[in-house]
Design a protein with these regions (language model features):
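Extended, folded cores of ATP/NTP-driven motor/assembly subunits in large transport
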Residues: 1-410, 420-421
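P-loop NTPase motor domains
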Residues: 35-53, 276-279, 292-299, 380-381, ...
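Short glycine-/polar-rich loops that comprise or flank the Walker A/P-loop
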Residues: 53-56, 109, 490-492, 517, ...
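Switch/coupling segment of Walker-type NTPase motor domains
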Residues: 60-75, 81-82, 92, 102, ...
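P-loop NTPase motor core of the ASCE superfamily
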Residues: 100-101, 540-585, 729-817
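Charge-patterned, long linear interaction tracts outside catalytic cores
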Residues: 125, 439-445, 450-452, 457-470, ...
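Conserved P-loop NTPase motor cores
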Residues: 312-314, 450-484, 497-504, 520-526, ...
Length: 817
């Protein structure tokens, strides 16, 4: 029987004149939380349930659908800049590819909570009793009219206003603990259409008009409008329902809990959370909860205790052994009685129903078996009562009553709070750059890298910098390249420091943006002498002077604490900075002019580098012009013949060529400061591949902090691509990194360090195993809201896969022959 009598906003009246207020509980992220954080959520939910001393609660987990096309269309609105047309075309192609892979819609679990509104005692005065009698009489007349005419359903405006006031108080109570949204008529209609087998409609696209006629004392709605969402041919069999529409049919089966045979220990009892990850098909769940007040609960428990004692005495008098079941039950009852007496808590009658649907009977059987096995593993025994399918179906409808008393479970608020209602895995944004999907839930993951600095509500960082860490071959460079590419398409600008020259073929492999790719390949050719001199590449003389000091102290090993050599070098650099033309070769001249033993020593030391391999790039005589332009959307800087030290090599063990290579990286990275200080309205990325090479030296570490701080002020993100999270884990840098991506690692110390970098429990073996077992292309990701999950990076297009793949090509058998 259809229970709903009237709907007004989020209020639902049923045929027994009970009124429920329904809300959508905005899901909260639950993945990778520490036990302490889980207990905080548990306590909040327990208090939410326990605050209702009487009445009923109806909790629903419903597998709704969200439109992929709609999300992609919203993402298009974020695109700006020169490559807008290319980006729009790319997003359209991406949409078609995603739809062909996973369909128009993807499953999106929503959580609904309904609370029965209880009339307060002060409303029992004479005036209200008179009004109540009058309303009852009017209701009788309306019922007669409805029975005879079967057209309109009416509700007194006074009645609506009275419950609306009560609902406001309730909403205020709940919203202190959880984010909620009041339901509307279209939410109820979607819910009913979903339960009656209609699918393929995205939740956000669904419309449902519920016209009302507001009269002076009452409001009318058409009865047909109320029942319209249930239009469908329902055929009941013993253990399933067949739901038939004009263009489709589906089969539905309902399970209920028969017994809980073991302890459901928290935290590992979060059924609502785990079943989202477990099942590849949609599963709906309903909890119909009736609150039993403390006094009534104690009476029930004490009566049960008397029954058990009678059984015990009867066995004793008959000379038999009391069965172990009775002894265990007596212990449990004693414990429960003490608990209820001390805590003054209520008990709860729980009717727990699971809905499984499928397009055909064979698939329904397979899915039912899978659901049953899942609950079996949790010590929960399910049953599919024959002939009760229609009744259990009714329990899912808003404001419905409990259908059957045979399968009631008596539970406490602790049990209900431990089921993980509202818990889900959320990652990234609702729209933006599609980078892949969550491994646990299969949901698409979208990012907006420029969002951190906007101070969006809920974000835990305003840092635009990002880190990509992981061992060789895990996919960090690929993920980094993909994110930079799409950021540029969406209107950003990027400069990539490419020490291994892996991106030199991008003009050929990315023809759609080739005109906006600028590859600067700096060779050690004599015509390029002095091209990377700090005085040549830096616009600001102060910045150039600062970089010149950094480079020369780095190469010569002179410390700023060296009271003999450092002042001499500093004076020479300052003098050159004040000249009309400046270059590092002039520093050597100034030192020779000084003509002291110390200055000659320093001059000789610096001069020994000037003609060593590609070091000539650093030394100019002041006549060289800056030939490096970073005005394109995507700029790649490559220095030929760089030899980077091994990750484990200490600074003291660097060879001369390695020392020079790192010096080059420091110069180019500092040059990126000028790029960062360009147009503040455009989001910019400075991408530092093999960042560990200069993060391990003092000058590089100082520079990275400088870049990150300048970036935050100037709408620019610095992306660190490195093999170890330890490189970016120093407090000064770690706190300024927003998005984090960690790829597979097998070293236990490195894994612990990475988990610590993410703010996770580094000693938790499950966390360690997750990171160790990641496949190629999968990463642990932390978004701007501090949420962590495992993402499968998904390029969608095969041409992007080839363009960004940095693995060496495998020779075919033909080549080998």
């Amino acid at each position: 029987m259809f229970p709903i009598k009237y709907i007004d906003n989020n209020l639902v009246w049923n045929k027994d004149n009970e009124v429920f207020a329904y809300y959508e509980l905005i899901p909260y992220n639950y993945s990778f939380l520490s036990p302490e954080q889980k207990y905080l959520v548990h306590d909040s939910f327990r208090q939410l349930i326990a605050q209702s001393r009487e009445g009923k609660i109806h909790a629903l987990q419903i597998a709704t659908e969200s439109s992929i096309r709609s999300i992609q269309e919203q993402s298009k609105k974020l695109v700006t800049g020169k490559l807008r047309e290319v980006a729009i075309q790319k997003i359209d192609d991406q949409t078609e590819a995603l739809v062909s892979m996973i369909g128009d819609n993807q499953v999106d679990y929503r959580f609904f909570l309904g609370f029965k509104l209880m009339v307060t005692e002060d409303e029992g005065n004479l005036k209200n009793i008179k009004k109540s009698v009058f309303l009852t009489f009017r209701e009788f007349l309306n019922e007669v009219r409805h029975t005879l005419m079967n057209d309109f359903v009416s509700m007194s405006n006074d009645e609506i206003n009275r419950y609306a006031k009560m609902e406001k108080l309730l909403e205020n109570k709940i919203s202190r603990r959880f984010k909620i949204r009041r339901l509307e008529a279209k939410d109820f209609a979607y819910l009913m259409e979903h339960l009656y087998g209609r699918d393929g409609i995205a939740y956000e696209d669904y419309m449902y008009p519920l016209p009302k006629r507001k009269l002076k004392k009452e409001t009318l709605i058409k009865y047909y409008d109320l029942i319209r969402p249930t239009r469908c041919v329902v055929e009941e069999s013993q253990r399933y329902l067949r739901l038939e529409h004009e263009d489709s049919e589906s089969y539905v089966s309902y399970f209920t809990v028969n017994a809980i045979v073991g302890e459901l220990d928290f935290p590992s009892s979060e059924i609502f959370y785990f079943q989202q990850q477990q099942f590849t098909f949609p599963v709906d769940t309903s909890m119909n909860v009736e609150i039993v007040g403390n006094k009534k609960a104690l009476t029930t428990v004490r009566n049960k205790k008397k029954e058990l004692k009678d059984l015990d005495n009867h066995a004793y008098q008959a000379g038999n052994e009391t069965s172990s079941n009775v002894v265990e039950a007596l212990d449990s009852v004693d414990e429960l009685e003490t608990d209820l007496d001390q805590s003054k808590e209520s008990m709860y009658k729980l009717s727990y129903v699971i809905r499984v649907s499928a397009p055909d009977l064979d698939e329904l059987k397979r899915r039912c078996d899978e659901v049953k096995d899942f609950y079996d593993d949790l010590n929960v025994k399910l049953v599919r009562p024959a002939g009760d399918m229609m009744g259990l179906h009714g329990e899912f409808l808003p404001a419905s009553k409990r259908y059957i008393n045979d399968y009631i479970q008596y539970v406490k608020s602790d049990f209900l709070a431990g089921l993980g209602f509202g818990a889900t895995q959320m990652l990234g944004e609702n729209t933006g750059i599609y980078i892949g999907y969550s491994v646990d839930t299969g949901r698409n993951v979208y990012l907006q890298p420029s969002l951190a600095s906007q101070g969006v509500k809920g974000t835990v960082t305003n840092a635009l910098a990002s880190a990509f860490v992981g061992s060789l071959g895990g996919g960090k460079s690929f993920c980094n390249n993909l994110l930079v590419y799409y950021s540029v398409l969406f209107g950003g600008q990027a400069v990539i420091l490419d020490p291994k020259s892996e991106r030199g073929n991008w003009k050929a492999t990315l023809p759609e943006i080739a005109e906006e790719i600028n590859i600067v390949n700096i060779t050690s050719d004599s015509s390029n002498q002095g091209l990377l001199d700090p005085y040549v590449i830096m616009k600001d003389v102060k910045d150039a002077e600062s970089l010149a000091i950094d480079i020369l102290t780095f190469l010569t090993g002179i410390s700023s604490r060296d009271g003999e050599k450092f002042p001499v070098l500093r004076k020479a650099v300052r003098t050159v900075s004040q000249n009309q033309n400046h270059g590092l070769l002039q520093v050597i001249e100034e030192l020779r002019k000084e003509d002291t033993a110390v200055s000659r020593n320093i001059a000789d030391h610096i001069e020994s580098f000037t003609d060593y391999d590609f070091a000539q790039l650093l030394f100019s005589d002041g006549s060289v012009e800056n030939a490096i332009s970073l005005d394109n959307q995507l700029n790649i800087i490559q220095v030929a013949d760089l030899v980077l030290p091994d990750k484990d090599t200490t600074f003291d063990e660097y060879t001369t060529i390695e020392l020079l290579s790192v010096a080059m990286l420091i110069v180019i990275s500092t040059f990126a400061l000028d790029f960062i200080h360009s147009d503040r309205s455009i989001f910019k990325i400075v991408d530092l591949d093999e960042a560990w090479a200069f993060l391990n030296v003092a000058q590089g570490e100082t520079l990275s902090n400088k870049l990150v701080r300048a970036g935050r002020a100037m709408n620019a993100g610095v992306y660190f691509v490195t093999q170890s999270s330890g490189d970016v884990s120093k407090e000064s840098l770690k706190n300024n990194i927003g998005l984090k991506f960690a790829f597979r690692s097998t070293d236990t110390n490195e894994i612990k360090q990475t988990l610590e970098f993410f703010g996770l429990d580094s000693e938790d073996e499950n966390n360690q195993k997750r990171l160790r077992d990641l496949e190629n292309g999968q990463c642990l990701m932390q978004d701007l809201y501090g949420r962590v999950g495992v993402v499968q990076i998904h390029p969608v297009f095969v041409e992007l896969l080839h363009a960004f793949d940095t693995r060496p090509p495998i020779k075919s058998e033909v080549d080998l022959e």
